[in-house]
Amino acid sequence: MTGLFIIALGAGGIKPCVSAFMGDQIPNKSPQLMTKAFNAFYWAINLGSFFSFLVIPAMEQHYGYSWAFAVPGIFMGIATFVFWLGRKKYHRTPPERNNGRAGFWKVLFIVLFHGGWKNAEQRCGASAVEDARHILKILSIFVFIIPFWSIFEQTASSWVAQGSRMIPLSIPLPGGGDWSIGPAQIQAANPIFVMVFIPLITVFVYPKVVTLARPLVRLGTGLALSSVTFLIVAFLQYRLEGGASMSIAWQLIPYCVLTISEILHSTTGLEFAYTQAPLHLKSVITSFWNLTIFAGNMLVAAITFFLSNGESANAISTDRFILYAILAAVVAVAYSFRARRYGKTE
C-alpha cells in the first residue's frame, strides 16, 4: 500500500503538469502545431507502455519481481536526471501569485450556498468569478468524457475475462516453438495500434477531414466510436455464449476501433484542456481532465456492483456489453448538443 500511495502521489503531481509544460514549450501556439505536439506526446507515452508490456513480464519471469520493479525505477531516475539537465533551455511560465483572489472552490461554495454569482462577485472579485465560470464551462464538456473511460478501462477487466474463453493465438518462433498470446498479452495491441495510428491520423486524416480539425468534433467522434467498439465486443460475446470456438485474434478488431477512439479522445482532451484554460489555470484544468478517468472507473464499478448484486462473475455477458454501447451512444448524442452550445473560446 505504501508503494501504491507513493506512485499515486507522484502521478498526481506529474500528470496535470507535464502536458501543460509540454504545451508551454510550443512557441507560436498554432492549432495545427498544438495538435501535432500533443499527438507526439501521447505517442511517447504509449511507447513506454508498449515496452512495459514487452520487457517487464519477461524481466519478472527470468529475474524475479525485485528486478521487475527495480528496472522501471532506475529508468525513471535516469529520465529525471536527463530532464534536469535541460532546465536552462525550457520555456518556463512562473506560477501566478494569488494576489488576494479567491480560489475556484470558494467561489463555487458562495454561488451554491450564499447568494449566487452576484454575491460571489461582490465577495471574491470579478476576476475570480470569471475564472470559476470558465472552469465550469470546460467541465461541462469533461463530464461527457466519463463514460468513455468506463469503456476504455474494461480492456484490463471484462475484455480479459472474455479473452480467457477464447483460443490463445500461437505465433511460430524462428528458433522453434511458439509464442502464445493470451488475454493478458493481447492488451499490448493497444499501445502498438496507438503508435501506428497516431502518425497516420495526424499526417493523412486530420489534413483531409476538415471537421476533425475542431477538438470538439474529435471528442464527439471518439465517443461514437467507443459505442461501436462495445457493439463489436457484444457480438463476440454472443458468439462465445452460443458455444462458438473463437481465436483471441478476433479481439484485435475492437482493440483497433477503441484505439482510434482513444486517440481522438486522449490526445484531443489534453490539447483541449491546455488551449481552453487561462494561463494561470492550465495545470488545474488538466487535473480535472485526469479526474474523468477516476470518475469513469467509479462509474463502471458502480454499474457492475448494482447490476451484478455485488458478484463480478455476472459482469461478462452480451447484455452488459450492449448496455455500455447504448450508454456511450446516448452520451455521444447528448454531447453533440452541448458541444454546439459551447462556443469557440480557443
Where are the language model's segments positioned?
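Hydrophobic core of transmembrane alpha-helices in multi-pass small-molecule transporters
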Residues: 1-14, 229, 233-264
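Transmembrane alpha-helical cores of Major Facilitator Superfamily
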Residues: 5, 39-47, 188, 192, ...
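Intracellular juxtamembrane helix-capping segments at the cytosolic ends
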Residues: 11-29, 255, 259-277
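Intracellular loop-helix junctions on the cytosolic face of multi-pass helical membrane proteins
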Residues: 28-31, 35, 56-185, 196, ...
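Loop-to-transmembrane helix entry/capping segments in MFS-fold secondary transporters
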Residues: 29-41, 181, 277-288
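A gly/Pro-rich, aromatic-decorated transmembrane alpha-helix motif that marks the paired
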Residues: 46-62, 231-235, 294-309
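Central cavity-lining transmembrane alpha-helices of secondary-active solute carriers
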Residues: 47-52, 188-205, 295-298
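Cytoplasmic membrane-interface "Motif A"-like loop-to-helix N-cap segments
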Residues: 206-224
